[in-house]
Amino acid sequence: MSIDWQNLYQERRATAKQFGEIWDLPIESRYHRVVAKHGGKGFSVLEVGAGDRSFEIKLQDYWGEVTYRSCDIDPTYTHDFGHIDEVTGEYDLICAFELIEHLTLIDAQRMVVRMHSLLKPGGIAILTTPNVYYPPAFLRDATHITPLCYDELGGLLRLAGFELRAMYRLYHDSVFKKIIRRYLMYPVFRTIGIDFARQIIVVAEKPVT
């Protein structure tokens, strides 16, 4: 698979036009609170890069009974699938948290295309990635490979056939730090082109038709 760079650039611009600048993105405190808005009882869910599978418990707390499947190349925990290419079935929701930045850009595109193919029509994909406007979030981990700006991630998803439904900055901190970073220091951050939010979360839908 190769990337059509001109089309990716156009989809990036379309994403920026839809959501504005990084500082225009609304703030949510936790990724699972975003997820909770986009599912319900009986949903079939695939988590890619599932780690210890603890996300399943959060889903059950929110929605009750769900069909949860996990995929991870790390054999530390037992998973339903060892690679996204091995995944079978169709899903209402596919999630990948803090995963895509560990891939090359080509592999990232392969992953979102594969996610699109595994979703039911009208199904939802939710991804998070470090916010490149908050440099420590990406730079502090040597296993991070590809920094993805919010419009770049949106462009990849649009290029794969998704429609973007929502995009947020994720930020949770003490009240004192929130006051300092979100209000007192905000003009300085914006002037020098950085942000206080550590992650970006994107909600994308596979069109019904």
Question: Which positions does each model-derived feature cover?
Answer:
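Acceptor-substrate binding/catalytic loop of class I
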Residues: 137-156
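Conserved N-terminal segment of class I S-adenosyl-L-methionine
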Residues: 1-95, 106-113, 118, 151, ...
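Short catalytic micro-motifs in class I SAM-dependent methyltransferases
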Residues: 97-102
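Substrate-binding/catalytic lobe of Class I Rossmann-like enzymes that use SAM or dcSAM, i.e.
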Residues: 159-166
